[in-house]
């Protein structure tokens, strides 16, 4: 099997992200083994940045 375009079609069988055990969001990367949203699997501390606070505030206003 070549490593170009034909093999990229095989990537759609398993999901890239599944539901995270810690935050519950669908952001846990199966291959890398950590959550993109909260950082579970990569560190014990919760993943948070100052640049994301504005978005979280806006999200809670609804």
Swiss-Prot record:
GO terms for cellular component: cytosolic large ribosomal subunit. A zinc finger (C4-type) spans 20-38. GO terms for molecular function: rRNA binding; structural constituent of ribosome; zinc ion binding. Keywords: Metal-binding, Ribonucleoprotein, Ribosomal protein, RNA-binding, rRNA-binding, Zinc, Zinc-finger. SUPFAM superfamilies: Zn-binding ribosomal proteins. PROSITE patterns: RIBOSOMAL_L37E. Zn(2+) binds at residues 20, 23, 35, 38. One of its GO terms (biological process) is translation. Pfam families: Ribosomal_L37e (PF01907). It comes from the Archaea. Binds 1 zinc ion per subunit. The keyword Cell wall biogenesis/degradation does not apply. Gene3D superfamilies: 2.20.25.30. Its cofactor is Zn(2+). HAMAP family: Ribosomal_eL37 (MF_00547). Binds to the 23S rRNA. Belongs to the eukaryotic ribosomal protein eL37 family. This is Large ribosomal subunit protein eL37. It comes from Pyrococcus abyssi (strain GE5 / Orsay). The lineage of its organism: Archaea, Methanobacteriati, Methanobacteriota, Thermococci, Thermococcales. The gene is rpl37e.
